[in-house]
């Protein structure tokens, strides 16, 4: 049936007869009709009519004449077409077009009622997007690296205290730069020439001399620069103290089958809410309280120093604002703004926030300190901002101390600050509260409005479930459709909360989950998620199984699995069992390597993260020494769709139909398909994940279920908590380069599938079919979350169809859809953008768990995105 469905969709504009399609598939009409109905849930005639009508509707909306569309899709007369159209959509084509136009008008009327971006924000946005003042008045090298160029004397001081001293140095010595017109102050503008952290360990620097030159040019003395590099010359990790890897392990790591790391920083959401509620004065008292109970401790000593320094951050900016207020040429409006800003900075972050302005400012200061401790922004995220800010917003509105328009402007200013350092700094709106009640509020909607008005890439996620207001889901989808930048993306509470509870997270904490970075799940202020620590390419298991346990790239024998000769795998069950044995071995080695890396993690002290993570101060344990309430390791599961497609193809063409022998296929794979016809047979004539085909979808589900069982087993054996995370980030290109040809028709070196999305170009049965396939996966066992990107043609993602998309999201919330991201773009536009990037500077796409401007991507990623199916049908 896969072949039949694919043929129908490829030739939908032609007049396809039942005799023709049954003959192509080699069945009698009676047998074909029975199989087809069982497979699709509708008759052949109904299916063809449905597909034609959805495509015809797009053409009608494009302005094509009814008679032209009728002829295009094989109708003998406009009357017959009109009748079929009426039966499908409940109206005639012209009325359908009119309804769509009216839907567009209604949206425009609604948009006109939204708060508009203020003139101030237009200027600040333009400056941020065009990076006009990034390297002008301020410098990351001068203001961040400069102050810590001469760290305190190392003798006898603990790592925690040295880091606290360096963070204090940055706070006290960095300049209080305030951009003209801004309402929220403070900055963290990254210079991509260097990456560092306060442990004094350098990440790779592309050009050391260039970095030296920049520092000297910014006024740092040559002596300080020399000391800086002497102190921070590329320190080797403590890996030299770890056990030597075996030749087999080295090969598996080099080829990407096994990557066991331990992400120890820049991927988290801290307890910013406590900064707003207590201020650093209150946090200092908390540390002192536990110090009295537990006794003196280096973590407490460091945390107290950070609290005292952080209290001065607001004062520093308040003093600068006070100087600005002396300017006699200030307008009355700006003078009033500066007075409010000074008052806010006198209050926060030292003391609790009293209103929305102070809350936004306090959170921004706290976030800056997070990134300063880590030395880069990366995936440090902000959490559920609509929930954090709502009490302040509600109180201000009720007291009449702020207007909704002013609140809109404050959120806009925060969005611009975050865009300045665009990285995956995730924020989340919607969801439920700790008791499970709907938590959608006015700010949830306002933040969606701000995101649309800003018209730039802003990492924003929406939490929803079957009990969420449909209007909220619809509004989020409108932003996706009109912004066309892949945001926001959607996380289903009805899947995510049970999956977290299954991993030992308390139900109330699970209900407060948020996203960090791309799609990674975290309990804000309570967890160290070690995001994307395990990165195994499970497709290598298929390669090993079909090559006598050896890599097809290097011919290295893989240890840990005693398998028979590949030619002895004379049944599908034997092949599957060997593939699964290799998957388990890959996961085992990955988890073991993660555990080894945790020893390195322990020496990477994070006193600021510890201060804002529940459990650390209470237990007197550092964030990276298991201090957090929840300490777990997310293990990515690469290539699940490819494994399912490969095993389904082997089952059909080798074991069931016996069209090819194992020897033939192994030869083809080792030599990257010298016979193109055989490759096309495996590519086109075997079922593929993403088309709602049980025989292949069930294999994908079985693979993930098996992986979850393995990770639970290794969690118990190794004394760690490993969370399944079927997500691939950008590494789908890299993993593919190190993987041989596979039975799904994939060439050697070709990328693997993105997360749990179908392999590009293989899903052709509509958005509903993709969702159905994904919903068959055991998503409630993957607390790290799954990730799927669905490409939709802009002609389908219209205002008229928003209710249909919202209904679909609500229905699939019940069925188990975990995370979905939409790209609303057509392939033709992307191809044009690839040819003439200067004409498409603002064209953005969903790449992985993040969006990016298309022209900034390398050609491999551009090609991958172009090749993804752009769905035109539900």
PLM feature segments, named:
Residues 2-19, 38-76, 100-113:
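Terminal helix-turn-helix DNA-binding modules in bacterial transcription factors
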Residues 28-29, 76-78:
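Short coil turns linking two alpha-helices in DNA-binding domains
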Residues 115-300, 333-340, 344-874:
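Conserved catalytic cores of very large enzyme subunits
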Residues 78-80, 88-91, 324, 335-349:
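Hydrophobic or amphipathic alpha-helical targeting/insertion segments
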Residues 84-126, 132-133, 137-140:
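…primarily DNA-binding HTH/wHTH and HhH modules…
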Residues 31-32, 36, 81, 85:
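Short hydrophobic/aromatic patch on the recognition helix
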Residues 327-332:
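Charged, low-complexity interaction regions
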Residues 301-312:
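Extended non-globular scaffold/tether segments
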